[in-house]
């Protein structure tokens, strides 16, 4: 029944290293579906460094980072990533999925609002659900729809609060602004935290998010912008930034 419904997963077995050409189930094929954009998976220098690290640290930390699993290699990597990105600090996770599950609930919670592209990755969707924030989906890569959804949401919330006389739950902003909207009268700005979240490059479609327009909207409404750039980091922009 699963096969008839198109829900049965066909697991491909890869023989050998990742590359432009790979052997799948005994057949050489062109690889168009891996994340090995920079060719690190089978790079001689990377493999040599990995072998040296295994000799020094073994094959794994054998513990979670917060207990006894953080090595000086983790710290060195995070420091170099921060330098690469030009930021104060970074933190690494086991996977992009884990990152979204951890980061989104740390930014928003009950009483806050997330504006999520309708084709965002499953990890973003799950992270938003875990946060317990209200989720508003906007049209794929559509800044006009995003602005309309934010305007509608903030005005509805403002009107409801004014009628009830209640103060909306407060989530202090992480950066700049008041986490409200500029087009409301002074003293009547909405205080819930607003988060706009999008993939940078959508892995299934290949679309690139219109980040300049999204950031402009975020600035206008006092929202935070979060970008999952798993498929753009190191690939797009000058020097991969």
Language model features with spans:
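Basic, amphipathic juxtamembrane/active-site segments
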Residues: 236-241
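N-terminal "arm"/small-domain region of PLP-dependent enzymes with the aminotransferase-like
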Residues: 4-59, 223
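Conserved PLP-anchoring active-site segment centered on the Schiff-base-forming lysine
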Residues: 103-122
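Active-site phosphate-binding strand-loop segment of PLP-dependent enzymes
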Residues: 136, 140-165, 183, 187-227
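Short, structured coil segments at secondary-structure junctions
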Residues: 110, 130-132, 221
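Conserved N-terminal alpha-helix of the aminotransferase class I/II PLP-enzyme fold
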Residues: 48, 52-96
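Conserved Walker B
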Residues: 119, 201, 229-231
């Amino acid at each position: 029944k699963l096969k008839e419904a198109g829900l049965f997963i066909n697991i491909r077995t890869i023989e050998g290293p990742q590359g432009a050409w790979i052997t799948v189930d005994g057949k050489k094929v062109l690889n168009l579906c891996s994340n090995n954009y920079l060719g690190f998976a089978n790079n001689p220098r990377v493999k040599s460094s990995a072998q040296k690290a295994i000799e020094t640290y073994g094959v794994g930390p054998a513990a979670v980072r917060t207990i006894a699993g953080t090595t000086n290699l983790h710290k060195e990597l995070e420091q170099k990533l921060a330098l690469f990105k030009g930021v104060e600090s970074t933190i690494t996770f086991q996977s992009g999925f884990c990152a979204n599950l951890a980061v989104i609930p740390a930014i928003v919670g009950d009483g806050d609002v997330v504006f999520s592209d309708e084709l965002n990755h499953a990890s973003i969707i799950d992270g938003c659900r875990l946060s317990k924030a209200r989720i508003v989906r906007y049209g794929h890569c559509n800044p006009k729809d995003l602005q309309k959804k934010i305007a509608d949401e903030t005005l509805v919330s403002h009107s409801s609060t004014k009628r009830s006389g209640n103060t909306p739950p407060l989530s202090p902003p992480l950066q700049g602004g008041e986490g409200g909207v500029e087009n409301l009268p002074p003293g009547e700005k909405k205080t819930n935290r607003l988060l706009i979240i999008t993939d940078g490059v959508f892995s299934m479609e290949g679309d690139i998010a219109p980040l300049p327009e999204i950031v402009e909207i975020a600035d206008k409404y006092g929202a935070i912008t979060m970008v999952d750039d798993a498929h753009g980091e190191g690939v797009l922009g000058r020097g991969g930034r």
